[in-house]
Each structure stands twice: as C-alpha cells, then as structure tokens.
C-alpha cells in the first residue's frame, strides 16, 4: 500500500516540499534562515492579528489603544513586544539570508532571487507602515519625512504625496489606510513566499561549494527538519530573551511621547533596520538624488546576477572576493551607525564615503576582482 502522504492531493504537495524533497548533503547553518523567516512571518501574523483586535486606527485613540493593550489586555504587553521585536528578528534573518545568497552565489537562480527582492520590498513597506501605527512622535514624524520624499518625483510628486496622505498632512486618513495596508501586506508576503519556494523547488537548492550536487542528495526529512528545529529553538530563545529582559532595547524612546505635529523631535530616524538606507539617502544633498540612491541601495541586488563575472559560483574558493564581501558588510554596519547619528561633522563625510564605497564595491570592485581571480586561475 502506497503511503498516504504520496497519494493524497494536498499531502503530496507538502510531502514533495518538506519531506521527500531532495536536498544537497552539504548545506550549512546558513541555509536555516529561509525556514527561520517562515517562523518569523508566522509569529508576526499571529501576534499582529491579536493586536488588531484591540487597536483603534484613529489619531485621537491610537496611542491610548496601544497603552490599553500593554496595561489592560491579558498578556497584551507580551503580544506588543513580541510583535515589535519580532520585526527586528525578521530583518536580522532577512539580511543574513540575503548575505548568504550573495556570498554563495544563490542569485544565479534569477527567478527565485527576483521574487526574493520583491519580498524584501514588501516586508520593508509593511514594517514602515507598522511603525506609524502606535502614533508616537517618531511614528508621526517618520511617516511625514519618508512619505514626503515622494514629492521629489517630477511633475506628479506633490499630488502623489497628498494622495497617499489623504489630505494636506499626515492625519487620521493616513493612519487608517496605513493600518489597512499593514494588515493586508503580510498575506501578500505569504503568497510571494509560496512563489519564492515554487521557483526554488524548480531548480533545487544551491550549496556552499556552488558545485552541482545532483549525484549527492539526501531527503529533507529527517536531516534538515531536525536542523531547522534547532534553528527555531535558538531564534525563539533569543527573541524571548530580548522581549522579556530588554523589550525597548531596539526601539526609540521618542515613540512613548504621543504624536504632536507642533513639536519636531531633535533627530528624526526610522527603526534600526532601515538606518543603512536612511544614511545613503541623507548622504546626497539633492532630494531627488537622495531618493534615487535610497531605492537603488536595495534595487542594486537585482543587477547582481548580471555583474557575476567569476567562473565559480560560490565565494568559498575565492579569497579576494571574500575580503571584498566582508568589507561590504563592514560598510553596511558603518552606514547603520551613521544613520542613527545627527547630521553634523564628521558623520556627514563618513556617511558619504561609506555610501560611495557601498555602490563602488557592488558595481565595480566585485566584478573586477572576479575577473582577476579568473585570470589567476588561468580560466
């Protein structure tokens, strides 16, 4: 008798995706982040659903409704901080997942990679709109500053901003629509995840060596299910520790002050996971130029497959490219730090230098070093 998991119309889809899926035998822990992101998305949707039951998207009551959740709802404080810090954990896993893809050449699966970039944009949009909902000072001013960037678009900019705001400033209409989209987008993200996995399972996984592993496959279950569960435990332990011991570590104290359009905070900044892009935006004195640089800082990932000049897929055997990769990581940390600093000397020049290096490494140095490595290996 054939096993039901191989014959049942629904179970066989799950079986071919998570049980009998052929996987390379050499996958390291860097391949855990896909499943960790799935867990993060699940946690965010669940906690968000329960928070939405108590939240009111009205400028007069939004801030108080969040206070009510924390003080009066059973374990409301836990839901709120799991959701807020869950977003941070989501982005940590997301950036590590993208970094893994860059290091090991996973971007050569162009469909999977491009859907991944769409996912990154969708998650960033979701997180931005979520940050506006508590209606604290940083929520209000962050929404004002970031949405106002669209006014840099020629001809239609001003009308576009007012259309998004639903008026002449960030107000009740803006908060209501942001809440609606913040609720909707995670489900669109979940649908995109299915497409991402569909394309991935068409080609099969890459592996650390970058060498085709067709002759050496093992079933996903039990080998990688156990490995993934260990990853879940480590990540959930880290998230629980953050939530229970230091829930406000990654937040901004200004967001505990109710939104006041008449009082601008001394330093407007987004959440920590957007600071690198915010630093690139600020490093260009021209508004339109800054907005283009901001978009390109993420969109540049789409042209990485075109810039791949090496005869080898992975960086595992390319020490010069490895040095450049880790320099890029250091620059991203520098940009994150600069994004959180005030706009004054010496931070301005450090931000501009780091921004230029960020684009130079990806666009020029990486392809040039790859060609040099090809030559050194006489290929």
UniProtKB/Swiss-Prot annotation:
Cofactor mode of binding and number, as noted: Binds 2 heme b groups non-covalently.
CDD domains according to UniProt: cytochrome_b_C (cd00290), Cytochrome_b_N (cd00284)
Organism: Phyllops falcatus (Cuban fig-eating bat)
Protein's cellular compartments: Mitochondrion inner membrane
UniProt name for this protein: Cytochrome b
Transmembrane segments annotated in the record for this chain: 33-53, 77-98, 113-133, 178-198, 226-246, 288-308, 320-340, 347-367
GO molecular function: metal ion binding; ubiquinol-cytochrome-c reductase activity
SUPFAM superfamilies: a domain/subunit of cytochrome bc1 complex (Ubiquinol-cytochrome c reductase), Transmembrane di-heme cytochromes
Cofactor field: heme b
InterPro entries with a match to the protein in the record: Cyt_b/b6_C, Cyt_b/b6_C_sf, Cyt_b/b6_N, Cytb/b6-like_sf, Cytochrome_b, Cytochrome_b_C_euk/bac, Cytochrome_b_N_euk/bac, Di-haem_cyt_TM
Keyword Transmembrane appears in the UniProt entry: yes
Keyword flag Repeat: no
Any one annotated GO CC term: mitochondrial inner membrane
Binding, heme b b562: 83, 182
Pfam families: Cytochrom_B_C, Cytochrome_B
Key words, A-Z: Electron transport, Heme, Iron, Membrane, Metal-binding, Mitochondrion, Mitochondrion inner membrane, Respiratory chain, Transmembrane, Transmembrane helix, Transport, Ubiquinone
Protein role: Component of the ubiquinol-cytochrome c reductase complex (complex III or cytochrome b-c1 complex) that is part of the mitochondrial respiratory chain. The b-c1 complex mediates electron transfer from ubiquinol to cytochrome c. Contributes to the generation of a proton gradient across the mitochondrial membrane that is then used for ATP synthesis.
Binding positions for heme b b566 per the UniProt entry: 97, 196
Misc remark: Heme 1 (or BL or b562) is low-potential and absorbs at about 562 nm, and heme 2 (or BH or b566) is high-potential and absorbs at about 566 nm.
Family from the record: Belongs to the cytochrome b family.
Sites where the protein binds a ubiquinone: 201
Protein topology in the membrane: Multi-pass membrane protein
């Amino acid at each position: 008798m054939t096993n039901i998991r191989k014959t049942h119309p629904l179970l066989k889809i799950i079986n071919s995706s998570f049980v009998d899926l052929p996987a390379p035998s050499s996958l390291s822990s860097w391949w855990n982040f896909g499943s960790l992101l799935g867990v993060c998305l699940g946690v965010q949707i669940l906690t968000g659903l329960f928070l939405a039951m108590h939240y009111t998207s009205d400028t007069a009551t939004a801030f108080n409704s969040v206070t009510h959740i924390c003080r009066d709802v059973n374990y409301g404080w836990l839901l709120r901080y799991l959701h807020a810090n869950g977003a941070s954990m989501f982005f940590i896993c997301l950036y590590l997942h993208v970094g893994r893809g860059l290091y090991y050449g996973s971007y050569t699966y162009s469909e999977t990679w491009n859907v991944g970039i769409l996912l990154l944009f969708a998650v960033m949009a979701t997180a931005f709109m979520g940050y506006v909902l508590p209606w604290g000072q940083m929520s209000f001013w962050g929404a004002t500053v970031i949405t106002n960037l669209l006014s840099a678009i020629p001809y239609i900019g001003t009308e576009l901003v007012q259309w998004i705001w639903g008026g002449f400033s960030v107000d009740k209409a803006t908060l209501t629509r942001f809440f609606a989209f913040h609720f909707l987008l995670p489900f669109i993200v979940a649908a995109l995840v299915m497409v991402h996995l569909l394309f991935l399972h068409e080609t099969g996984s890459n592996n650390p060596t970058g060498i085709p592993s067709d002759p050496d496959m093992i079933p996903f279950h039990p080998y990688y299910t156990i490995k993934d569960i260990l990853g879940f435990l480590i990540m959930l332990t880290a998230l629980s520790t953050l939530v229970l011991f230091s829930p406000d570590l990654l937040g901004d104290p200004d967001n505990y002050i109710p939104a006041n359009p008449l009082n601008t905070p001394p330093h407007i900044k987004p959440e920590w996971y957007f600071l690198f892009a915010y630093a690139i935006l600020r490093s260009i004195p021209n508004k339109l130029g800054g907005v283009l640089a901001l978009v390109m800082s993420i969109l540049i990932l789409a042209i990485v497959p075109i810039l791949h000049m090496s005869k080898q897929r992975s960086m595992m055997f390319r020490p010069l490219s490895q040095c450049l990769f880790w320099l890029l990581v250091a620059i991203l940390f520098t940009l994150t730090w600069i994004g959180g600093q005030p706009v004054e000397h010496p931070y301005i020049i450090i931000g501009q230098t780091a921004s230029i290096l960020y684009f130079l490494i990806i666009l020029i140095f990486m392809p040039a070093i790859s060609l040099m490595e090809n030559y050194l290996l006489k290929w």
